Amino acid sequence: MLGLRNIILLSPPPTQITRPSLPPVNFAAVEDNNTVGEKVCRDCGNRAKKECLFERCRTCCKSRGYNCVTHVKSTWIPSSATRSSSSPSERKKKLKIDKQSSPNVSLLPTTTSRQERGFREGLPGKIEAPAVFKRTRVTAISNNEQAEIGYQATVTISGHIFKGFLHYYGVDHNKAFPCLSQK
Amino acid sequence: MGMVGLRDVFLVAPAYHHQNAGVISGSDHMNSNAAAAAALGVGVIPLLTAGTPQQNVEDSDINFLGNNRRWQNNNNNHETQYLHFKSTNQTTVGTSSNNSGSGSGASGTATCQDCGNQAKKECKQRRCRTCCKSRGFDCSTHVKSTWVSAARRRERQVMPTGANPTAGSSLSTSSGTKKPRIVGSQQQQQQQATSHTSTSNTPPQSFETSSSRQDGGGSREAWPGQVRAAAVFKCVRVTAVEDGDDEYAYQAVVKIGGHVFKGFLYDQGLEPKEGFPSMSDLHLGGSANNHNGVSASAPILDPPNVVYGGGGGSGGGFYS
């Protein structure tokens, strides 16, 4: 027990020496074989690529609607398909988001996309603003499911552009919301 | 030989998951885990399980123990939800190999419909934690808990590994082939993925349907391709996994074509000058002066709702 504790106490100083420039000292997994300083996704904690400017994994880049240069649409195969190697035809499954949902506004990815403190305090809690809703098609991983219709919304609030996907929730039985398409 | 290695990697992850859930316990599984770990260089999992009772003094381990307790509580909920899932959806028959061996556990793994990660069988939406959060589903399985991120888990695993010379030698032997270790690390990451989104309003009960599929192709064509209209956006706080700064996003609930769409709008950065018309700038300028952001027309969402409230608010927030 004492030996284990001594060994544990000796390991933190090398990581601090390895990363002197990062303000939040993260004791990430440092291995001699791997490259030092692996990134983790800021939303879900999964491992993110170093080239991603938004510091997020593929899933969170997709869900946030970022036009990430690194996580471009490709012939990516989910890990469950590679795990089930019994049938090779299942490797054709792909994560599909229709390319027609790309916005007209070409936003340049910025490394400092975080919101500053003064900007956050000035954000209104509730706002009614004109927005653009574009229909998009979200395809599930397995090809058995039909494509699902969603809407991509883009709005400008306090000089910032907010963008995201609105997913289908069901029929409005109680008529709680006014219909936007009838306006 | 490589295929055998891949299969051994497959066997490790569900056994680890079951051990955390408290379903499978025995020396045979420990031996099999140790053998697979020695073969592939993933010698961290048994060390973590073995080292847990010795490190009760540290705060992070206490969180881990709390996480174990929470999982045990969730395990009871999972069983009832699984029965409920079977009773509601009889058309989509899921695999009924929950408590069987690790081999069939790997074959019967439910995958997330959005990203392909490994999803829990008890989740009605058949999605992982990350996609349930991003889609705004009020999933009772993926409830906010004292979850520890994969990076911190790997951080704890590496400390005894770096000190252990035998584990170092196994890592050096596995350095020749990168694919098995990457797959192993991905399996560890898939089971621990979440994003803490604290929204003040939960969707009403009438929208929580186990089968959220859309109608046939005919009604889908009735939905317009593009709509320019004013909608109400509610500010929500999105918390990062680490203790970094929070970020604010906007939640929108709109009705298009008689159906309700809901989602989160994230900050993309400053607006380009040539991007949007000046009408929105003038409107936003007027709204920015008013700190409450109450518009002239009657708002769709109720004003007395707490904007920055925690998760699990009242269900009637969307009714006016």
Curated annotation (Swiss-Prot), chain A:
Keyword Nucleus: yes
Nucleus recorded as keyword: yes
InterPro entries in the cross-refs: SHI, SHI_C, Znf_LRP1
Superkingdom per UniProt: Eukaryota
Chain residue ranges for the region called Disordered: 79-121
NCBIfam families with a match to the protein in the record: LRP1_Cterm, put_zinc_LRP1
Protein name in the entry: Protein SHI RELATED SEQUENCE 6
Organism the protein comes from: Arabidopsis thaliana
Gene that this polypeptide is encoded by: SRS6
Swiss-Prot record, chain B:
Compositional bias (Low complexity): 168-177
Region of interest: Disordered: 90-110, 150-223
Biased composition (Polar residues): 193-214
Keywords associated with the record: Activator, Auxin biosynthesis, Auxin signaling pathway, Developmental protein, DNA-binding, Metal-binding, Nucleus, Zinc
One GO term (biological process): auxin biosynthetic process
Gene Ontology cellular component terms for the protein in this record: nucleus
GO molecular function: DNA binding; DNA-binding transcription factor activity; metal ion binding; protein homodimerization activity
Annotated Zn(2+) 2 binding sites: C112, C128, C132, C139
Regions recorded as binding DNA: 112-139
Disruption phenotype: No visible phenotype.
Any matching Pfam family: DUF702
Tissue-specificity statement: Restricted to lateral root primordia.
PANTHER family noted in UniProt: PROTEIN LATERAL ROOT PRIMORDIUM 1
Protein name: Protein LATERAL ROOT PRIMORDIUM 1
